[in-house]
Amino acid sequence: MSDASPVSLVCCDVVGAAAADGSVLERAFAEAIATQGVVTGTAAYVRSMVQFDRTRGWSPADVMHSLFPGDEIRAQAASLAFERSFHAAADRFGILPLPGANDALDKLTAAGTKVCLLSCLSRPAFSMIMERLGWWQRADLLLCADDAARGFPWPDLVLTAILRLGIGDVRDVAVITASESGVLSARRAGARLVVGMLSDVHDAARLRRAGATHLLADIGDLPDLVAANGEVPAMPAHRE
């Protein structure tokens, strides 16, 4: 057994790691860039979708600025269009908790572990997700892109959670995320456990390359992993 102190904070990147978005993000992104003339069937559309995949976990505003570098007007217009499309797509396709997510959050809280639910989405988008999931009271802290200077892949959101919740050591933190950029953020923040959630966001190979210390196919296994300070197998091969 390790002499390490127990994990006192779990930061959960909601979309992908704890909730399924039913491709709402991708649909909203495609609709948003279409307002700027980037439409299906064009080379620009293909490049944009590659960039969307590469930047999963980034704030939508940062993604749009990466697509339209030096063109602030188009980047801002696309960001506004994304916000509108995201809400509309969520109405059409829904956002649901992953199986086991509610129980996992309950078990972490019951064990005395602080929980931060976070996302690089804007406050209105994140608030809408919390409302749909009924998770306003599920965590000790809720953070979105508007609460930190930078989103993923930078460490700001995780570090903000650490500061606001009074965690004394970054090594007492676990982060669970489904995106490569989320893993990078957790590593840069110094989290001890960096858990990659196997989903339709990024695959096991990408999460491992980014620095995930563990992989989970079921968020229901997270409380046991945290309780064991990461000293249990959690890198299944069947979801490669």
Residue ranges and their predicted role:
Residues 18, 97, 115, 175-176, ...:
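Conserved SAM-binding loop
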Residues 5-6, 88-117, 123, 127:
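Short, acidic loop-to-helix structural element flanking the phosphoryl-transfer center
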Residues 39, 136-140, 168:
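Conserved H-loop
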Residues 102-109, 162-163, 183-188:
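Surface-exposed amphipathic alpha-helices with a cationic face
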Residues 3-99:
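N-terminal helical cap/lid subdomain that shapes the substrate entry/recognition surface
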